[in-house]
């Protein structure tokens, strides 16, 4: 018996994008309030899931700061919306080797963190998915 394809559609909005997206557009939110406001607007526009990274509010550089994740989480949950909050847990696992002839030392863009540090904000904020 063939399986019937599920035709339900769920829209996911990646609010900030990943990596260093802060200079790609002036519309990429930076502060926790801007990120939460963008997530809330996406949910009101029909997104079922909002995927959030946090950023340094001044530079826009990606951050793992649990306090900023907590602010985003609280603002989204305090809004009158029904949305699945998806906090990233993908930071801190980037090893960037040098060129093939000299792979070490690691490139400056390497971002390594312990498993505990990589998910500290998840344990604190308890999003629906990460």
Q: What is each model feature region?
A:
Residues 2-27, 90-104:
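N-terminal small/glycine-rich loop or linker at the start of catalytic domains
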Residues 11-15, 50-52, 83-89, 128-130:
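Hydrophobic faces of well-ordered beta-strands that scaffold small-molecule active sites
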Residues 27-36, 64-71, 108-116:
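Glycine-rich anion/phosphate-binding loops
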Residues 35, 42, 53, 130:
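Conserved, mostly hydrophobic/aromatic
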Residues 36-45, 72, 76:
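Structured alpha-helical segments in the cores of large, soluble enzyme domains
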Residues 60-89:
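Alpha-helix-loop-beta-strand connector modules within alpha/beta enzyme cores
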Residues 94-130:
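Extended substrate/RNA-proximal surfaces in nucleic-acid metabolism proteins
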């Amino acid at each position: 018996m063939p399986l019937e394809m599920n035709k339900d559609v769920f829209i996911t909005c990646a609010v900030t994008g990943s990596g260093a997206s802060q200079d790609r557009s002036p519309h990429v939110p930076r502060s926790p309030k801007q990120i939460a406001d963008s997530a809330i607007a996406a949910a009101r526009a029909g997104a079922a899931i909002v995927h959030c990274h946090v950023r340094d509010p001044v530079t826009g550089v990606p951050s793992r700061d649990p306090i900023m994740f907590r602010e985003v989480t609280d603002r989204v949950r305090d809004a009158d919306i029904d949305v699945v909050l998806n906090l990233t847990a993908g930071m801190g696992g980037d090893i960037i080797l040098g060129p093939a002839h000299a792979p070490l030392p690691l490139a400056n863009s390497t971002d390594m963190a312990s498993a505990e540090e990589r998910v500290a904000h998840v344990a604190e904020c308890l999003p629906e998915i990460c």
